[in-house]
């Protein structure tokens, strides 16, 4: 069983929600990323999303765009990101790792080469923002052969027929984008999210995890009452940016944000 499936099965049996942090690999410099990954796990992360830096991250807001710029300026490439996962795996064989990014770097490497390298490194899932399930269907068997799950995004603007297609092709978990627009947007209507998730639960048994707008323990707990997991990105990447000149301070900053969210989720009264 894939590490992602194992983790969500364990969480379900414990009636707990997943805490899924996102950080951009190589930000502020490649040598720090593995330490940040371990810090996230120590703070209570259940799954790690590791962003592959790309020069045109169209779905991301300015916070993550700048993180990509910092990582690329330090020479971070897809092959480096895979090396980071391999290094992480040397001391953590349990925490699922999902690579999140855009199609271009994977296409340049070649799907088969990427899938093999990702398997060898210990990657569990892949979420390519700009690759729809119809196109992913062509490479999904290759990914599956190498133990990589294909994870997809859903949004408030996704039509019911489109949502059904995504649910049919999805694996691991579904990433529900709670807000229209780009990452880092401000307002979050949890009641609206609950209404939007309801029909999706009729379509799939996959865990539904919500991202965009998760800023602190309160928003994490509120979303955790209606979703199977919360995904936090910009709130963490902002802390990395604030401490880019003193990277030794970043693990504690990440732990502070995630620790607050973990505590809030665990205190939550359930759904």
UniProtKB/Swiss-Prot annotation:
A single Gene Ontology MF term assigned here is: tryptophan synthase activity
Q: Which residues form the active site?
A: 49 (proton acceptor), 60 (proton acceptor)
Q: Which UniProt keywords apply?
A: Amino-acid biosynthesis, Aromatic amino acid biosynthesis, Lyase, Tryptophan biosynthesis
Give the highest taxon in the source lineage.
Answer: Bacteria
InterPro entries from the entry? Aldolase_TIM, RibuloseP-bd_barrel, Trp_synthase_alpha_AS, Trp_synthase_suA
- Enzyme class at the top of the EC tree: lyase
What's an example GO cellular component term for this entry? cytosol
What EC number(s) is this enzyme filed under? 4.2.1.20
One Pfam family, please name it.
Trp_syntA
User: Has UniProt tagged this entry with the keyword Metal-binding?
Assistant: no
Is Ribonucleoprotein found in the keyword set?
Answer: no
So what does this thing catalyse?
(1S,2R)-1-C-(indol-3-yl)glycerol 3-phosphate + L-serine = D-glyceraldehyde 3-phosphate + L-tryptophan + H2O
Pathways per UniProt:
Amino-acid biosynthesis; L-tryptophan biosynthesis; L-tryptophan from chorismate: step 5/5
Family under the similarity heading = Belongs to the TrpA family.
Q: How does it assemble?
A: Tetramer of two alpha and two beta chains.
Q: Which PANTHER family is this protein grouped with?
A: TRYPTOPHAN SYNTHASE ALPHA CHAIN, CHLOROPLASTIC, TRYPTOPHAN SYNTHASE, ALPHA CHAIN
Question: What is the annotated role of this protein in its UniProt record?
Answer: The alpha subunit is responsible for the aldol cleavage of indoleglycerol phosphate to indole and glyceraldehyde 3-phosphate.
Name used for this protein in its record: Tryptophan synthase alpha chain
Q: Which organism is it from?
A: Chromohalobacter salexigens (strain ATCC BAA-138 / DSM 3043 / CIP 106854 / NCIMB 13768 / 1H11)
